[in-house]
Amino acid sequence: VSGCEIEGTVENSILSHDVKIAEGAVVRNSIIYAGAEIEKNAVIDHAIIDENVKVGKGAKIGAEQKGSSLSIAVLGRDITVSDNTVVEAGKIIDENV
């Protein structure tokens, strides 16, 4: 993907331009918009991350899904998720946490 820096793992996901995925970070089954930064050891699973979002080290966004019912975690534009924060599946976050 143009302009992305991927040092972690990305599976079944869509990345826009200028996304940074740090070493040890995992992104699965998610959509990550432009300028987002996923820091070291963060896990993103079944989530939509809007533009210019920073996900801190060790944060957990969304959850692995099983069965036919899916819950997507959504992070709004220009927010910061602090280190080690958990955002559960189905939550919509539109301010810093």
Label each region the model flagged.
Residues 1-97:
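Left-handed beta-helix
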